């Protein structure tokens, strides 16, 4: 007779237990999607790193001074099965990426993410550079939450997770879109056939080739003029020797044979006759 009266109480207790909010399941989903920074920067995405915009003014309403903002990095196929850690000991470090496909890094306090204009005149872009700590690979005793370079092109997905001082999650953002890193090409895979080039590229190449030919011709002409003096040296003007006589130009006069025959013996043209000293 007493059993039917206890059964409704058991059902009521079960409903209360199931309906009681669990701390691990009451996460606030923040309508924010992490993305690559929109700042005009070189190398926003490289072969081992990528730069995210900082989540400023995103987690302020859900956090306290003792909370920590974590970045969760996962392969795209592992992001669907990622389970938020419940304690600090369960937070996965960077080596777990190669085994479990995800890890957490870049712990930040709310003081490091001020809600203000990022263009503060310091000249530094407010970004979070994932995979920027190259020293992690060389340090055998690397920090637990080291920001090591990413091992492959991905693709990756990231999200921000807010935890309290005990490591219990409080809020999280959406997962980002796919982030693929850059990949280098082997020299043999690069097609150098001119037919693959665009028309503008062919015109520019032709103009540069013509200019190079003109410069070469100008160089050869200048070189030939410069070294011609070495091949054919100029003749130096004849120098006068010491003791040489330099006088006015003398014009000779032609004397007809008839006049030369009438001159007395012993006389020459233009000379007076001298008396003979012979007896």
Swiss-Prot record:
One of its GO terms (cellular component) is plasma membrane. The keyword Glycoprotein applies. Residues 222-279 are cytoplasmic. The chain crosses the membrane at residues 201-221. CDD domains: UP_IIIb (cd09969). The keyword Transcription does not apply. It comes from the Eukaryota. Its main location: membrane. It is a single-pass type I membrane protein. It is found in: Cell membrane. Expression is urothelium-specific. Keywords: Cell membrane, Glycoprotein, Membrane, Signal, Transmembrane, Transmembrane helix. Residues 27-200 are lumenal. Glycans are attached at residue 77. InterPro entries: Uroplakin-3 (IPR024831). Component of the asymmetric unit membrane (AUM); a highly specialized biomembrane elaborated by terminally differentiated urothelial cells. May play an important role in AUM-cytoskeleton interaction in terminally differentiated urothelial cells. It also contributes to the formation of urothelial glycocalyx which may play an important role in preventing bacterial adherence. Belongs to the uroplakin-3 family. This is Uroplakin-3b. It comes from Bos taurus.
């Amino acid at each position: 007779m007493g059993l039917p009266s206890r059964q409704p109480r058991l059902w009521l207790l079960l409903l209360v237990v199931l309906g009681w909010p669990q701390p691990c399941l009451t996460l606030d989903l923040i309508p924010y999607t992490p993305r690559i920074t929109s700042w005009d920067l070189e190398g926003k995405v490289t072969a081992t790193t990528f730069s995210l915009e900082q989540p400023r003014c995103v987690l302020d309403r859900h956090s306290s001074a003792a909370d920590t903002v974590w970045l969760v990095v996962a392969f795209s196929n592992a992001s669907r099965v990622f389970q938020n850690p419940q304690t600090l000991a369960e937070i996965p470090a960077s080596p777990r990426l190669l085994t479990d496909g995800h890890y957490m890094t870049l712990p930040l306090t709310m003081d490091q993410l001020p809600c203000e204009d990022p263009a503060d005149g310091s000249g530094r872009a407010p970004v979070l550079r994932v995979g920027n700590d190259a020293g992690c690979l060389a340090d055998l005793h690397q920090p637990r939450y080291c920001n090591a370079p990413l091992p492959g092109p991905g693709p990756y997905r990231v999200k921000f997770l807010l935890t309290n001082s005990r490591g219990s999650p409080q809020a999280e953002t959406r997962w980002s879109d796919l982030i693929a890193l850059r990949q280098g090409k082997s020299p043999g895979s690069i097609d150098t056939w001119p037919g693959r080039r665009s028309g503008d590229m062919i015109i520019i190449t032709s103009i540069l080739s013509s200019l190079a030919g003109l410069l070469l011709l100008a160089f050869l002409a200048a070189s030939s003029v410069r070294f011609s003096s070495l091949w054919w040296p100029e003749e130096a003007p004849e120098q006068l020797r010491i003791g040489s006589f330099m006088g006015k130009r003398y014009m000779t006069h032609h004397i007809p044979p008839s006049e030369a025959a009438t001159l007395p013996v012993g006389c020459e043209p233009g000379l007076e006759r001298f008396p003979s000293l012979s007896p």
